[in-house]
């Protein structure tokens, strides 16, 4: 039995992506500036991981229903509330932010009252600790270093596999994706916490993967078509990989949509940010990282790339 590959688009498609190069550059610059300005004015909605807060340690008489608990405490209007098991499944850590001593005591009592009235468990409150913002600053620095090292590792990989100017194209696209992702977080007031740092790193990985697929096809077509100029080759390469790109986007967006709808509050910020980042990363792979090669690549300069 013969198996046919799934294709959303015809085999021969000839859309002129490069014709929109200036428009896409202008559009991306405007969005990046808006993101910068918005972040500068409205900042981020830092979660407990970065802003500090209160940690309540509780032991219950049985394993709690964590998703239901998160839903109940999330409706109290006191901001982000993080629930985690530690030690045994009956030991529970409850974390939330507090900006004053008055709110601190009020919110602790509010949480205790809500748990007692909504759940049939016996609660033994063992400890209440304050986590200062100093820990948050250390986490911010660690998150920034993680992104920096990921950028450097990606640049080395692209330089070894292709050439330095391919790496430059991906670097510009990644900076664009990260700026827009951070701007989106600021605009939507998503909690800025460790899970959103993981989401940004996921976006970086997805965007690089998409760009490498197109770059591979560009290199292959440079070997095949000696008389075509670089603009024609980039257009051809994007069109040839477009069906794969669309299928990948659809499947990953559907998976993220399921996480947004059914994953619960614990991974909501992560799922929404990755959903947005997949769209932005796909756009940047087609309209930024590939077209930017025209600034560097010509037939004479391509020799090293073709031979690799």
From Swiss-Prot:
**Could you state one GO cellular component term attached to this entry?**
plasma membrane
User: Which stretches are annotated as coiled coil?
Assistant: none
Q: Which domain of life is it from?
A: Bacteria
* Residues making up the signal peptide according to the UniProt record: none
* Transmembrane stretches, start-end: 28-48, 140-160, 164-184, 194-214, 246-266, 272-292
User: Which keywords belong to this entry?
Assistant: Cell inner membrane, Cell membrane, Membrane, Protein transport, Translocation, Transmembrane, Transmembrane helix, Transport
- What is the topology of this protein in the membrane according to its UniProt annotation? Multi-pass membrane protein
Localization annotation: Cell inner membrane
A GO molecular function annotation here is: protein-transporting ATPase activity
Record carries keyword Cell membrane? yes
What does the similarity note say? Belongs to the SecD/SecF family. SecF subfamily.
**Extra info from the record?**
Belongs to an operon consisting of at least secF-nuoF-lepB-rnc.
Which HAMAP family does the entry link to? SecF_B (MF_01464_B)
What PANTHER family does its record include?
A: PROTEIN TRANSLOCASE SUBUNIT SECF (PTHR30081:SF8), PROTEIN-EXPORT MEMBRANE PROTEIN SEC (PTHR30081)
On assembly, the entry states:
Forms a complex with SecD. Part of the essential Sec protein translocation apparatus which comprises SecA, SecYEG and auxiliary proteins SecDF-YajC and YidC.
Provide the function of this protein.
Part of the Sec protein translocase complex. Interacts with the SecYEG preprotein conducting channel. SecDF uses the proton motive force (PMF) to complete protein translocation after the ATP-dependent function of SecA.
> What name is this protein filed under?
Protein translocase subunit SecF
Q: Which organism is it from?
A: Rickettsia rickettsii (strain Sheila Smith)
Phylogenetic placement of the source organism: Bacteria, Pseudomonadati, Pseudomonadota, Alphaproteobacteria, Rickettsiales
Gene name linked to the record? secF
